[in-house]
Amino acid sequence: SCNAQNGNPNEGGIATDAAAETGTVQIGYAGSNWGAAAVYNYSNGVGPASGTPLAVLSGSGIDGAYFESVNSVGLSAYWQPSTSGWVPSISVGWGINSYNQGDTAFDYDGAASQSWYVGLQWDDAFIKGNALGMAVGQPTFITSCGDICKEFGKDGNTPYDAGYAWEWWYKFQVTDNISVTPAIFYLSNPL
């Protein structure tokens, strides 16, 4: 707990109404060449937001606009071909967060954010032991911002702050224990 050292149960402590806590439950399964997982997280006492400019604005502490709690769900999966070749291994993931606020001058409840990615990797690309890969996705971005967007003339349910992140890499297997992986990154909407 970030405020466990405060013994006043109205301001902190452990397992009190004012304590900040988090809990996570995850389940997963893996077969011989595939796997899938799901996760749920609840966090209380989240505090000020960080991230994209809109995320910071909607939970920045201005007028008491701190996020009080967040419920998060994530899903991920992967599949690998039984033999390497032209068919790549595939990894996918998606997550969503739903934010709730405490007492504030604005009603920002209803804020939500999401993220996703898709990754492809070709093993034994060009030379046995090397790998070529790419990934694309959107880092966490606001998909619904409740009343804070209405304050700025937005509809509150349109994705904002969305940008794409791309990565391309090639792994050179130098020895059995050493590999070198140069990569190129592209961000369509850097902070």
Feature annotation, model-predicted:
Residues C2-N6, G31-N33, Y42-V46, W94-N100, ...:
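Transmembrane beta-strands of outer-membrane beta-barrel pores
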Residues S1-A30, Y164:
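Aromatic- and glycine-enriched pocket-lining scaffold segments that form the walls
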